[in-house]
Design a protein with these regions (language model features):
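The conserved acidic donor/metal-binding loop of glycosyltransferases
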Residues: 67-71
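Short aromatic/hydrophobic "clamp" motif used to bind/position activated sugar donors
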Residues: 63
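A recurrent flexible, glycine/aromatic-enriched loop bordering the glycosyltransferase active site
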Residues: 128-153
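Glycine-rich, basic loop-to-helix element that forms the pyrophosphate-binding segment
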Residues: 44-58
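Short, well-formed alpha-helical segments that are part of the catalytic scaffolds
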Residues: 14-30
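C-terminal catalytic/acceptor-binding lobe
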Residues: 145, 159-223
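Hydrophobic targeting segments
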Residues: 4-10, 37-39
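Conserved donor NDP-sugar-binding/catalytic core segment of glycosyltransferases
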Residues: 76-117
């Protein structure tokens, strides 16, 4: 394990998006003494399988899992995340948007989401802003699930490709897995959004089936 390496992991089926994503990564300020690596997984069978494949190939302590249409615009993103991890070894994963308490439905959108994000849709860009200061005085909010557009870890926990073999609920599942392993999942305090997510059109064809799996595994049978 390389304690001074940060690996960005991107599952992609669109190299133009991936190149733009990597453009922003390469313009981040890298903390002194650290190095970065970028792994792309093309045409993965599922998000979980792609992430597991890349995770096993990397020796970096810190890993940033992100969509190919996520663009990191906060130049000090890496320093901010590493600072949180080093001061709080019990924190296993950081997101930019999350829910304090997962609804019984298993759908994050059914609860208040905290954090900041520029969401770029087909015809407009929206600012999602629900400051964590409204419910905590800490510089981060402990949450039960984070949105998968960006997920930053300091420990490796396998993604549940045995259960989620498509493109939905991998993020909520991984959040629950970190909590099951005794780690905290958090959303940090932000003055401005750290990322832009070019959402485009959202496909929900497999969503309900994956939701039912999630509810059965994590909501009906909590550990």
């Amino acid at each position: 394990m390389n304690e001074k390496e940060i690996c960005f992991i991107i599952c992609t089926n669109n190299l133009l998006y991936a190149e733009e994503c990597m453009y922003y990564i390469r313009h981040l300020n890298v903390p002194a003494g650290y190095s970065i690596d970028i792994l792309t997984v093309e045409d993965a069978h599922s998000m979980t399988s792609g992430y597991n494949e890349a995770m096993q190939c990397s020796h970096a302590k810190y890993k940033v899992y992100l969509h190919h249409d996520t663009f990191i615009v906060h130049r000090e993103f890496l320093s901010a995340c590493i600072d949180i991890f080093q001061k709080n070894p019990q924190i296993g994963m950081i997101g930019n948007v999350g829910v304090h308490k997962m609804p019984a439905s298993g759908v994050m959108w059914d609860a208040d989401r905290y954090g900041m994000l520029y969401e770029q849709h087909i015809y407009e860009t929206q600012l999602l802003m629900n400051r964590i200061e409204s419910i905590t005085e800490q510089n981060y909010l402990e949450v039960e699930a984070i949105d998968g557009f960006i997920m930053v870890t300091q420990y490796d926990i396998p993604w549940r490709e045995d259960l989620f073999d498509k493109w939905d609920f991998y993020d909520a599942s991984q959040s629950m897995e970190f909590i099951r392993h005794g780690y905290k999942v958090v959303v940090p305090k932000m003055e401005q959004p750290w990322c832009v997510h070019d959402c485009g059109f959202i496909s929900l064809g497999n969503y309900e089936g994956e939701r039912q799996k999630f509810v059965q595994e994590y909501m009906d049978n909590p550990r």
